[in-house]
C-alpha cells in the first residue's frame, strides 16, 4: 500500500509540477500511518518494534524486534570495510536472504560496500528519470518516471526499515533479496525502461491533450 501510494503521489507531481501535491501526499501518509498504528494491532506492533527496538520484552516476544536488532548488530559488525565476502554470519539474522539482505551485505562489505550499492541504485533511478524527461510523449514521461521512483521507494523503505529510520514493512530490496514475484516485477521494470530509452533517441516529443 505504501509503495503504490508513494508512486501515485510521485506521478501526480510529475504530471502537474505542483509541489503542493507532494506535500499533501506526505502529510496523508504520516496521518494514515498514525491512525493505522492506533487501530490495527499488527501495525501498532511494528511501530513498537521501531520506537523501542532494544526493549528486552519487545525483542523476546513473538513478532518482536529480534531480527531488527540482529540486523543492526550485523551492520555494526561490518564497520567501514566489512568482514569480507563469505566471512559474515548472516544466519544470526532471521530472513537474511530476503528482508534483511542489506544488513548481511553490510556485515561483509562494510559501510563502503553499502554506499556502493546505494550509489548503483541512484544511477539506475537517475537514468530512469532522464528517460522520462526525454520521452516522446507525456505517457512515456509518466511511465518512466513512475517506474524509476518505484525502485527508489522500495530502496528507501527497505534501507530505512532495517536502519530504524522508518518502521519496517514487508517489501524486498530490489534485485538483491530472494523474492520470486518481486524479482520478476523489478526486472520487468528494467525491460520497460530499456524499451522506452530506445524509443526516445530518434522520435520528437509529442504532447497529448
Q: Which positions does each model-derived feature cover?
A:
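A juxtamembrane structural motif centered on a specific transmembrane helix
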Residues: 157-209
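Structural signature of hydrophobic alpha-helical transmembrane segments
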Residues: 1-5, 114-118, 183
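Structural signal for the C-terminal ends of transmembrane alpha-helices
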Residues: 9-19, 36-37, 122-132, 193-200
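Loop-to-helix entry and N-terminal half of a specific, functionally important transmembrane alpha helix
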Residues: 131-170, 176
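Hydrophobic transmembrane alpha-helices of multi-pass, membrane-embedded glycosylation machinery
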Residues: 2-12, 27-31, 122, 190-191
Amino acid at each position: 500500500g505504501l509503495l503504490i501510494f508513494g508512486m501515485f503521489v510521485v506521478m501526480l507531481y510529475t504530471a502537474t509540477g505542483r509541489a503542493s501535491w507532494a506535500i499533501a501526499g506526505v502529510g496523508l501518509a504520516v496521518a494514515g500511518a498514525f491512525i493505522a498504528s492506533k487501530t490495527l494491532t499488527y501495525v501498532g506492533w511494528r511501530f513498537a518494534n521501531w520506537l523501542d527496538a532494544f526493549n528486552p520484552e519487545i525483542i523476546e516476544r513473538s513478532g518482536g524486534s529480534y531480527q531488527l536488532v540482529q540486523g543492526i548488530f550485523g551492520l555494526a559488525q561490518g564497520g567501514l570495510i566489512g568482514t569480507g565476502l563469505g566471512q559474515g554470519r548472516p544466519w544470526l539474522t532471521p530472513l537474511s536472504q530476503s528482508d534483511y539482505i542489506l544488513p548481511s551485505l553490510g556485515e561483509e562489505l562494510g559501510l563502503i560496500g553499502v554506499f556502493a550499492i546505494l550509489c548503483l541504485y541512484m544511477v539506475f533511478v537517475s537514468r530512469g528519470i532522464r528517460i522520462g524527461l526525454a520521452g516522446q510523449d507525456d505517457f512515456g514521461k509518466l511511465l518512466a518516471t513512475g517506474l524509476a521512483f518505484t525502485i527508489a521507494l522500495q530502496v528507501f523503505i527497505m534501507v530505512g526499515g532495517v536502519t530504524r529510520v522508518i518502521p519496517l514493512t514487508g517489501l524486498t530490496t530490489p534485485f538483491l533479496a530472494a523474492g520470486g514475484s518481486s524479482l520478476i516485477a523489478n526486472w520487468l521494470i528494467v525491460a520497460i525502461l530499456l524499451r522506452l530509452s530506445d524509443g526516445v533517441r530518434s522520435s520528437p516529443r509529442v504532447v497529448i491533450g
